[in-house]
């Protein structure tokens, strides 16, 4: 009887901890204050016989070659990370002040 109670409590604690970990991971994944973007630069990169990678000279600045370990080819990608939490939340008065003003005069 004592062993069954102890086993039941262990299982209950394990389930509780699992739910807490799941909840914290999904909450962190849904953070709307962070944005990570990846864009394809329109070209691929290759590794030559000397072991150096071809440069990524695409339309966009900041293109880098990303490749899997052991592969001789990769993709030229541009990555950008934006943390919106560094910007304050605009108040309604700031939004009103930033709106374009409507001209009430009529042009002929």
Swiss-Prot record:
Signal peptide: 1-28
Residues of this chain annotated as glycosylated in UniProt: 44
Subcellular location: Secreted
Single GO BP term: negative regulation of chemokine activity
Protein name: Evasin P1156
Biased composition (Basic and acidic residues): 96-108
Keywords: Disulfide bond, Glycoprotein, Secreted, Signal
Residue span of region Disordered: 89-108
Lineage: Eukaryota, Metazoa, Ecdysozoa, Arthropoda, Chelicerata
Coarse class of the protein's main subcellular location: secreted
Function: Salivary chemokine-binding protein which has chemokine-neutralizing activity and binds to host chemokines CXCL1, CXCL2, CXCL3, CXCL5, CXCL6 and CXCL8.
Cysteines paired by S-S bonds: 41-63, 45-65, 56-76
GO molecular function, one term: chemokine binding
Tagged with keyword Signal: yes
Gene Ontology annotations for the cellular component aspect, listed alphabetically: extracellular region
């Amino acid at each position: 009887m004592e062993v069954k109670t102890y086993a039941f409590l262990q299982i209950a604690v394990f389930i509780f901890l699992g739910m807490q970990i799941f909840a914290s991971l999904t909450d962190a994944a849904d953070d709307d204050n962070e944005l990570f973007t990846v864009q394809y630069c329109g070209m691929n990169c290759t590794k030559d016989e000397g072991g150096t990678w071809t440069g990524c000279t695409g339309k966009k600045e900041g293109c880098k070659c990303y490749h899997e370990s052991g592969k001789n080819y990769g993709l030229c990608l541009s990555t950008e990370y934006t943390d919106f939490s560094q910007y304050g939340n605009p108040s309604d008065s700031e939004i009103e002040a930033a709106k374009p003003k409507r001209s009430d005069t009529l042009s002929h």
